From Swiss-Prot:
It is found in: Cell membrane. InterPro entries: DDH_dom, DHH_sf, DHHA1_dom, GdpP-like_PAS, GdpP/PdeA, GGDEF_dom, Oligoribo/pAp-PDE_c-di-AMP_PDE. It comes from the Bacteria. Has a GGDEF domain (residues 175-303) preceded by a PAS-like domain (residues 74-137) which together may have ATPase activity. This is followed by a region with a DHH (342-498) and a DHHA1 (592-645) domain which together have c-di-AMP phosphodiesterase activity. The PAS-like domain is important for heme b-binding. It is a multi-pass membrane protein. This is Cyclic-di-AMP phosphodiesterase PdeA. Gene3D superfamilies: 3.10.310.30, inorganic pyrophosphatase (n-terminal core), PAS domain. The lineage of its organism: Bacteria, Bacillati, Bacillota, Bacilli, Bacillales. Residues 175-303 form the GGDEF domain. Belongs to the GdpP/PdeA phosphodiesterase family. It comes from Listeria monocytogenes serotype 1/2a (strain 10403S).
């Protein structure tokens, strides 16, 4: 600093002053020697003055810089000791060399020098030895949250205590809004047959139970119609409700059942959305999904993330009406007449229900003067379906309208109508490309609705209370024009679908099922032919026997059978094996794991109704009904699939979804 002043402020001005003094004294000497002497004296005085002031200035600057340097060093020392940031120095063996006072208060030990990080703070050691080069990392340690920065070359760890921020953020998240819509599934049906006194008593009972439940959990509840409530709560309240598995479902069902009025609830919940309108839309969408799955359950949705389900463990009561069947039939008729042609497609490896309902839709299209085509893959059929297809070959007017996916893709247009039967999952249809090519799509299914669904269908007819899709299609005939009578082969195929899905009218069979079967019989359905379709050969029998032979009981009547890793089994054989196992004493639910012809691992699940196998299969990406469900797994072995199944069963018994 002094060199700077000497160089820039003393050296050159002083030289200039001396030179000017000499020149001026020489010039004035020729005129007057005393004037020249005066100039010399003045120059000397100025030079001395400049030296003096320059010296004082330099001293003042030196003093200022010295004081400033001292203050900076002092502040650095105080910062290391007093600032609210932890500093930890460690050696090459990850032992503590020094910590500042701020950080030392977090440790239990008074003397930390020489202590191993692995013992006093293994979380810190993980940060130091980790490969993360992103800079700031967050860790949890002793009820605190720290943001950390590691300087590995200098062996320094900086820690910022963010516990207060995280606690505040956690509190903010816990208090975010949650919107719920509560629906009394079958309130109207029960209320219609009651007198005013009983209806009022039922209404008071349900309202009182829901109000007490809401008050218990600090939920705002408001009744908006006779069978609908809305509720506002927070995410913290929602978490508590999930922990208790929404016991209000069981309470309402059990309490009303004692009065011979088994009322059930469906609850749709939306959360993780700041916009209240979108939050309400999420809740309504969740409720629609809950009702589509049969009711008596809770569905929780967020904008991003997996949908969660609770309840739905009881067999749903039949709620569909003739009025709905008529409305759907008329809507389907209108869509058919507006199209140029109709294509019908079911799920891969179609069963009798798919073929029967497809032929039924084809006949409905012909009743409305439109050509219809059933899409199948000839090489991917079970033996019973092959026998049905062989019989159809005797009917030229029918067989000519059965086409492959390639033919359908070549002929489908923007005005064509595609009807998807017996499934609502895009991943399960015979040909995904055909589904994507269709502008107008109708879905008719009897499986409980899952999260995966056909995008933007123009008409949806899903009735999980029906025995089969064939039953639903049969009911639509009554409201169609009589231009074309239902033929014997269509009626027989539809009856076959009902027989297969109900296991000869023993499972999921309601009064409407018998009505549909009776109607089909009146149209000429051949029951003897149905039995011929369902006959099995010796190979099928022996394969099924081998599967049943591998049966093992896992948990409270849960029977599991597995095929060999390299032996392929058709889906029908696996399903039949599951049915056979279910007929054995002590078996409440059966699961058959096999290698399918498409190289996927398939799991067929059956139950007597006390155990909801659909919930178990949904945990593995599948679905179905309470007593009849299945799934397919990719890139796993049979042994690995069995482990996944056992985990899903364990989660089911724990009440997890």
């Amino acid at each position: 600093m002094s060199g700077y002043f000497q160089k820039r402020m003393l050296k050159y001005p002083l030289y200039g002053l001396i030179a000017a003094t000499i020149i001026l004294s020489v010039i004035t000497f020729f005129f007057s020697w005393w004037l020249s002497a005066l100039v010399v004296v003045g120059g000397i005085i100025l030079t001395v003055a400049m030296f003096y002031f320059e010296y004082r200035l330099n001293e003042d600057v030196q003093l200022y810089v010295s004081n400033l340097t001292y203050r900076i060093k002092r502040s650095e020392e105080e910062a290391l000791v007093e600032m609210p940031m932890g500093i930890l120095l460690y050696d090459e063996h990850y032992k503590i060399e020094w910590v500042n006072p701020f950080m030392s208060k977090y440790f239990d030990k008074a003397e930390l020098i020489g202590e191993s990080l692995e013992e006093v703070g293994p979380e810190f050691l993980d940060v130091i030895t980790g490969n993360d080069e992103k800079g700031i990392m967050s860790i949890a340690w002793r009820d605190h949250r720290f943001d950390t920065i590691v300087k590995r070359k200098e062996r320094i760890l900086y820690l910022y205590d963010r516990t207060e921020y995280y606690d505040l953020n956690k509190k903010f998240q816990a208090n975010k809004s949650v919107f719920a819509v509560i629906f009394l599934d079958n309130y109207d049906e029960w209320a219609q047959g009651m007198d005013d006194r009983r209806r009022s008593a039922l209404n008071n009972l349900v309202t009182s139970m829901l109000t007490n439940w809401a008050r218990e959990h600090r939920i705002y509840l408001k009744r908006i119609s006779t069978d609908r409530f809305m509720a506002f709560l927070t995410e913290e309240m929602l978490k508590r409700l999930e922990e208790e598995k929404f016991q209000i479902l069981d309470r309402i069902r059990e309490r009303t059942s004692k009065q011979n009025i088994p009322l059930t609830l469906s609850i749709g919940i939306g959360y993780k959305e700041d916009d209240l309108i979108q939050l309400a839309d999420l809740a309504q969408s969740s409720l629609d999904l809950a009702l589509g799955r049969g009711g008596d359950q809770v569905v929780i949705k967020q904008p991003e993330g997996k949908v969660r389900f609770y309840g739905g463990k009881t067999n749903p009561m039949e709620k569909r009406t003739r009025v709905r069947a008529r409305v759907i039939s008329q809507a389907l008729q209108e869509l058919i007449t507006q199209s140029d042609q109709v294509f019908v497609m079911g799920h891969r490896y179609p069963d009798m229900d798919v073929i029967g309902s497809s032929l039924g839709v084809m006949r409905i299209a012909e009743m409305n003067d439109r050509n219809a085509y059933v899409v199948v893959e000839p090489g991917k059929m079970s033996p019973d379906v092959k026998r049905l297809m062989n019989e159809i070959e005797e009917y030229p007017n029918v067989i000519k309208n059965i086409v492959t996916p390639q033919v359908a893709l070549e002929n489908i247009t923007e005005k064509s109508l595609l009807v998807v039967v017996d499934t609502h999952k895009p991943s399960m249809v015979i040909n995904k490309e055909l589904l994507d090519s269709a502008t107008n799509v109708v879905v008719v299914d009897h499986h409980r609705r899952s999260e995966e669904f056909v995008g933007s269908p123009v008409l949806v007819y899903i009735e999980p209370y029906a025995s089969s899709t064939a039953e639903l299609i049969t009911e639509l005939f009554e409201y169609q024009p009589d231009l074309e009578q239902v033929g014997k082969i269509e009626a027989t195929a539809l009856l076959s679908g009902i027989v297969v899905d109900t296991k000869n009218f023993t499972l999921r069979t309601g009064s409407r099922t018998f009505d549909a079967a009776s109607y089909l019989r009146s149209l000429g359905a051949d029951t003897i032919l149905v039995q011929q379709f369902l006959k099995e050969d010796i190979t099928t029998f022996t394969q099924r026997s081998r599967l049943v032979e591998s049966l093992e009981i896992y948990h409270d009547g849960m029977a599991i059978a597995t095929g060999h890793e390299d032996e392929e089994f058709g889906t029908v054989i696996a399903a039949q094996a599951a049915d056979t196992m279910l007929s054995m004493e002590g078996v409440q639910a059966s699961f058959v794991i096999t290698l399918r012809p498409d190289k996927l691992i398939g799991i067929s699940a059956r139950s007597l109704g006390q155990i909801n196998v659909q919930v178990i299969m949904e945990k593995l990406g599948g679905g179905g009904h309470l007593s009849n469900a299945a799934t397919q797994l990719k890139d796993v072995t049979i042994a690995e699939a069995e482990k996944q199944l056992i985990s899903a069963i364990d989660a089911y018994w724990k009440g997890e979804t």
